[in-house]
């Protein structure tokens, strides 16, 4: 039988060395293992928990350890993070089990060191060192919520200290799985009833009239109706974005940055599978996933094309009733789903607003007069959101703003998300 702690250690080492993103490394490890359902849950909690709490755990290590940070071997740091996370955050794991299992995985040369740090944490009452909020608010946020200082600084400058703390707290919550009903095949009410019949606790989403929140931690592919294409995974914020597109039967719709395809699927379903949805992406291999997803859902009007969304296509000028630009973004609204983003310096995304604007400008040329152009991101940074919409409207008098909206994880119980709806008026 596979050991979930050992697998977690291996996955975390791969993530620490930047070999793989956590979701990919974890999915691969689970598929290769023979873990029971409870052990899969423990493995997932350990991997995501350690990554989400990395800076907090490192602060504990730095307080308890006499060595300089650079003198701690990488494998020892990973083991310490893994053991400390269980001691500090997993009440259901006994202290002795957390210590013994972690120490047993350690190479001989660091076993005593790992054991000493873990036991010192227990002896100290499991106290987490916390900087003073008033004296050093950035350091306080970084240690308490485990976001890199540069990201803390950007959020405080944008939202203020108190609102930043509210957002960081919300980003630490693990959201329910959200599904969009494939109404080509079933109603939301019937799907909810079918899931309940299988013992799955699920609820309708608050705003989207086709969304379902699955409260149980069940693998998507094992849920009732997955193989039959009765639903696909899509956050409620993305569902509302697609709804704002107002795609109707018989229309021509362009999804300029389509992968992984959920917005294209949603538009096609809203169109009752009549008309045309053109789904484009920069990478051919990603488009194959869109095609297989459409096939599972019974969508036949979707076409794919490999292309850079910034590159003009003269044959598409004024040819689409609806155009969606879900542009590449910093992702600073989906920390709960992509925990590695907590440690990304915003400076690394400084070029994104100009890239996003270039995509928006090019895509706008494909919209018919009277048609809609929807711009969306999964970030909360205004420079990628309202700022880009304002820049676009200043230079493009043929469009008017119908609506723009930011959704927040604590207020809307969705991803952090932004969308703007524009209409071509001449």
Residue ranges and their predicted role:
Residues 1-426:
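S-adenosylmethionine
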